[in-house]
Amino acid sequence: VRPGDPVSVGQDIARRGDCGVAIHASVSGRVTAIQDRPHPWGGSSPAILIENDGQNTPCPQRPQPVEAQNVELPLLLERVQAAGIVGMRGEAAPTWEKLARAAGRVDTLIVNAAECEPYVTADYRLLLERSEKILLGASVVARCLGAQRAVIVTEGDKLRAVESLERRLLRRGHSVQLCTVRTRYPLGAEKQIIQTVTGREVPPGGSALDASCVVLNVATLYAVQDALFRGRPLFHRAVTV
């Protein structure tokens, strides 16, 4: 896009140069400038300034939703990259690259919903309010990667979310498993959660792949299923206020 261009909600307006991940407009309106702005991680970064028109006009070129049984690995990677999905636990690494590296190399998909920090409840609300979609997303991603099992991990004191997931697992006969952990920091960290779920240790300097696992934050997984089954790119998320 260029200054003066109109944009709509969900429109692809830029690409991250290092990985090709798409960046989408979160409002509709008009581009007023493209300039460097302060970045939360320090320094500055190129930014697209959009004057919000308040109309929330949706992008007409939204990808068509797909059926779960029709999702294979190439389509999964294509949709995740086009939707601009990155790790939502803080690292912001391209999710399509993470999935591509894991394909055929893992036996376990771990969906990390363990929020060990005080007062943080965004992942808990996702489990409670979107449990069916999270279960579907986990089963589809695990199948595409060739993983034999998918495990959702949350704290044992999240009783309502645990009960909601257990009801759906029993009713639908999902292949997805549920694992509860103690509410103790840093059990939500990747290496600790892998050891808790599988008993395997990630070697020093290694990654989850060395333990035949791939770990996705539950918000990241929810964004993946949104991209597949609603054609919705990543420009929003649940946060704790």
What are these regions, as identified by a protein language model?
Residues 39-93, 103, 159-160, 172:
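Acidic low-complexity segments
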Residues 58-60, 109-123:
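Gly-rich Lys/Arg/Thr-decorated short loops/hinges at beta-loop-alpha junctions or inter-strand turns
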Residues 29-31:
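Conserved hydrophobic positions within beta-strands
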Residues 15-16, 34, 51, 112:
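Residue-level recognition of conserved beta-strand edge/terminus positions
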Residues 128-145:
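Histidine-anchored nucleotide/phosphate-binding helix
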Residues 148-241:
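Hydrophobic alpha-helical positions that pack around
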Residues 5-6, 22-26:
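Small beta-strand-rich domains/subdomains or short beta-sheet motifs embedded
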Residues 2-15, 33:
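Short, well-structured beta-strand-loop connectors
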